[in-house]
Amino acid sequence: MDARYNPPAIESKWQAHWRELGLDRTPELTAESRKFYALSMFPYPSGSLHMGHVRNYTITDVIARHKRMQGYAVLHPMGWDAFGLPAENAAIDRGIPPAKWTYQNIAQMRDQLQRLGLSYDWEREITTCAPDYYKWTQWLFLQFFKAGLAYQKEAPVNWDPVDQTVLANEQVDAEGRSWRSGALVEKRLLKQWFLKITAYADQLLADLEKLSGWPERVLTMQENWIGQSVGARVVFKTETGEELPVFTTRPDTLWGATFMVLAPEHPLVEKLTTPEQEVAVKAYRAEAAARSEIERSAEDREKTGVWTGSYAINPVNQERIPIWIADYVLMGYGTGAIMAVPAHDQRDFEFARQFGLPIKLVVQPPQGGVTSAEDLQAAWTGEGVLINSGPLNGIPVGKGPGQSVERAIAWLEEQGLGERQVNYRLRDWLISRQRYWGCPIPIIHCPHCGIVPVPEEDLPVLLPEDVELTGRGGSPLAQLEDWVKVKCPACGADARRETDTMDTFICSSWYFLRFSDPRNDREIFRKDLVNAWLPVDQYVGGIEHAILHLLYSRFFTKVLRDLGLLNFDEPFSRLLTQGMVQARTYYNPNKSGKDRWIPTALVKDPNDPRDPETGEPLQVIYATMSKSKGNGVDPEEVLANYGADTARMFILFKAPPEKDLEWDDADVEGQFRFLNRVWRQVYEFVVRGSGTESLQGKAAELLQAKVEAGSLTKAERDLRRAVHTAIKEVSEDLEEYQFNTAIAGLMKLSNALAEAEIPDSPVYAEGIRTLVLLLAPFAPHMAEELWQALGGTDSVHRQAWPTYDPAALVADTVTIVVQVNGKLRGSFEAPADVTPQEQERLALQSEAAQRYLQGMTPKRVIVVPKKLVNLVV
């Protein structure tokens, strides 16, 4: 064993040895196995790891390593979410085929992951852009299609009129312009493929109650995204006989509806527009088409709209009300039509004031002072009683039994004017992408048969390789006539392939299932294997995936359960959302945009940071690492300077996993010093010649004999108590994922060993051995090297996790606090079995009592057994 800790040498040595040994290979499950499936959200292969990756994967790796040592059969895989727009953009910008760019990045990132000492079973690696994976993505699409859960309909897309192509939302800037051409983006209707996730909305909502191992914050985000609302469906008829159904959560305010508003995309707009209003309506619809849904929904935006020229009849009071169109109403939510109640809805109130529309009060506020709409400065949305509401006058406003909403629904149903309805904010999942680098949709369009699924035996539908990507001219696949032209599988006629590819979220919605049987080329997975390994016991990933990825994965799991492939209905038992990695960040408040952020490398003096261009003083904050802020820390530099084990220890020690972590070079150095200290402790133990003995032979036997005979010295009992306290506390902290306090426990044990003056005792040998075993999940390379130096014949990672001896935790003495008139004045040690009477006697004899009493006799003595004595004078 070398006297000096040399991370590069030992880390590369053990990584190679572990690969050769197959140390991280997933074991076969048996009837006796306790399984544990640990999974990090797999990455997009961008080409290089960032510190957020390192934190995520280190957390999961510690959990996996700990579980292995506890005797679990552990599945801990890694793969690549490899389809997506960045590869296509790289192909356009650099002239590199997306596949080549992607696989180069995968090779680079795989190497980085291996150098971090992450215990992945690389034999189970999957890549979503590989045909042997996307064959089964296509197979799943066909199962959804057969079950009526995949369908095609027209939907609006972002259209670049210059490049003649569809843009993803992230390719449209804040001003509504294309990121590439700069053209103002238009909304166009195209036929798109959808998955019917709304069919599972009620289950997705109800089953959130089963997820006790998920953060409450994530459950709330999913609940809000699904967005269940209970109300009524009411049909308004136009004067020309057209029906306009609306969904409202406030049917009790129907008597206050003074106009209707339709989304500009509503299919009845053209029919309802009178000749006099045709020009204005057409112009407004064109303006609305250029705006994003986020922009249209902004509450602080000035309301715009135009009258269609038509009227509807309010079904509850037969009043004639005008029909408007406005972009704050979205076609994608509800029916695309609303009844506007300006007195009691703020958006409707602002719209009515903007265009001089009538406002009718139907809720009387409880405090009075508001008797008509003229008294309102804003919509009244609080409690009160109904007025001007016909049969519902005087009913208290609320959603409870006997209150206004329930009474209104009951009345509407009695009158045949409406019915109770449950609505969801959740919309069906639009999965079509007019892109090349995605999973082809296995559908053929036949002029005679219509939509025909590709036969399963013809899967996968392979992506063609000879494609020129320009970013212009619509779907790249649609331009490849040789690929598009195909015979109809049903009738043999000339037909055409579907040229859309799938949303990449499809690929990540089932990958965790494939890891159970990743090399199966006959079926998507063996049912016995997937149902044995799943659900995932611990899933780790960023809060940014709290909604879409997790919701889609839950949806897929429930569908596959209903198809008879799975016997569970939730994919992830426990979820840990790790915090962000932040770093010291400099910005100039006198600048704007990207220019305000000053890269760390350009700041000469961190103690007096100044703008390198202007000399102005800079402000300093901690912000999430990013290229735009120039505050990133390259994992490669940390590995080169300190090694993987130090990087892991810092990340785990600096903050609890769910909290944001502030990068600090001094703290990295601190962890490096701690590992050096442990190295020296083991080195000095080994060079004394007792290393091998500590694991086998005399030392262990001698310790057992001394424990059984009760012949341990006080120093040995104290050290053994520290050793077994560390086992207990580190084990408990690991179960709760409190990695920072677990490492603090390792430091306490190291301190106890350093302070113990019994280096030749078998208790000291037990302490050294225990320290190395407890260190193994956190600093795996160093622990392996130290274990071998101590005489280990097998890997430290194949050892049983230490268990503590409860008897060793019992203290010989207890510390008794001495108070005088309730104020702390001192303390003393007493036997652990001290009686209250003896405790009082010892307290009166203590140095603290003698000093403060000065011969006086206390009026009272209060004894808290084995804790304190309070002397009242």
From Swiss-Prot:
Coiled coil (UniProt feature): none
Primary location group: cytoplasm
MF-aspect GO terms: aminoacyl-tRNA deacylase activity; ATP binding; leucine-tRNA ligase activity
EC number: 6.1.1.4
Keyword DNA repair included in the entry's annotation: no
Entry's Gene Ontology BP terms: leucyl-tRNA aminoacylation
Protein transport recorded as keyword: no
Subcellular localization(s) per the UniProt record: Cytoplasm
CDD domains given in the database record: Anticodon_Ia_Leu_BEm (cd07958), LeuRS_core (cd00812)
GO cellular component: cytosol
Reaction catalysis annotation: tRNA(Leu) + L-leucine + ATP = L-leucyl-tRNA(Leu) + AMP + diphosphate
Stored Pfam families: Anticodon_1, tRNA-synt_1, tRNA-synt_1_2, tRNA-synt_1g
Motif 'HIGH' region per record, residues: 43-53
Keywords linked to the UniProt accession: Aminoacyl-tRNA synthetase, ATP-binding, Cytoplasm, Ligase, Nucleotide-binding, Protein biosynthesis
HAMAP family reported for this sequence: Leu_tRNA_synth_B
Name this protein carries in UniProt: Leucine--tRNA ligase
